[in-house]
Each structure stands twice: as structure tokens, then as C-alpha cells.
């Protein structure tokens, strides 16, 4: 078993998509950084790495058995044992995982570049561990967007885009044709005449298809207008407006 020591982690909880587990250059000052005193390192197949990175499904039992109580976190000068915490790599990507006692990868973190490089060097000499790959089918939808819809966006843009999709999903649930036409017209005023003749589903499909790729000031404006008067959404919006890096 290979081990890493003094590893800095920035846990992202409950993220089923790897694009939301931010790389070091997107870490923020108010993120909660922890120091892993000791953590086992596993080299696995690309398929299993992708499964761990992009799902919240059960981890293979042999993997959990191999790492059981072999990691420690340092908090307030105390060394605390963790049930199932490990760093995993397929030689092309690196991810730290803590199940917080469960069997699924609840918490995930990237590593700082220097420590990531160390993992690659150690993995180059290591044998790949042969764990069974659980059967699963990854399904993307408006509340769990496909990676290509988030490609090239900053952390703030990804968060706001997911907020926009949440607001659009709520709009869809109203089945209100007049509202749907109004918001599509807000997005594309030049199509006003055509939009007035559209059914709810036609307007919805076109608005979603036109907003799902990329991110722009138009996207941001639509998002801000859609969430007005909705305290939960407004709070999420405000969290991304505070002065931060990325």
C-alpha cells in the first residue's frame, strides 16, 4: 500500500459531477481547507476512476476494505482516524475521496499541483489495482448537466449556470404558457412575434436549447431576472456575487 503525507484537501460534498470538484486554481479564500496527515494512494483503471469522480454510487467493497481506517486528518493538533479516505489516480487524473463512514464518495477534492505531481510520479511505478467496476448508467439532465455544457466555464459561471437551470426547471414545472413566452421573449426579443404563437413546450424547448451552451452576460441577466423574489435562489445568487477569486 502506498501512502501520502501532509496532503492539503478542499472538500466538495455531494458532488456527482467531477467538473464541480474544483481544481486548485479555483479554490477560494473562504473554502475549508484540511490537512490529511496520512492517506493511502490507489492506482485504478480509467473506468473506475471516472466512476468515482462522476457518481455518488457505492464504491467496490474490496477498495473500501483496503483503505479502512488507514487515513488520518490533522485538526487542532489532533490526529483523527478516518474510516474510508483515500487518494485515487488512473495516471491521468487525481482525486481525494472521503466517504465520511458511508460506502459512497460523499466528499471529493483535487490536490495542490505539487502534490498532484507527486501522485503521478508514484503512480508511474505502481501496479494498477484490480477492483470490480460496479454497473451503472450515468444520466444527465437539467439539474445534473452534461460536462460539455460546463466546459470552459469558471467556478462562478458554473454555479450561476446551474442556478439558471434550476430556475428554468422551476419555470417548466409551472406549465404556464404566458410566463414561458414572456421569459423566452426576454431572452430573444427579436423573436417576439413568433414566440406569441408558440405552445408552452415549443417555447421551453427553444429557450433551453439556446441557453444550455456557453455563458454570457445575456445568460447572467436572464438568470438574475428569473430568480427575483425567490429567497432561496437569491441567496445562491448573492453567494456568487461577493468579491472572490474565480
Curated annotation (Swiss-Prot):
Pfam families registered for this protein in UniProt: DUF3603
Family, per entry: Belongs to the UPF0736 family.
Name by which UniProt lists this protein: UPF0736 protein GK0808
Taxonomic source organism: Geobacillus kaustophilus (strain HTA426)
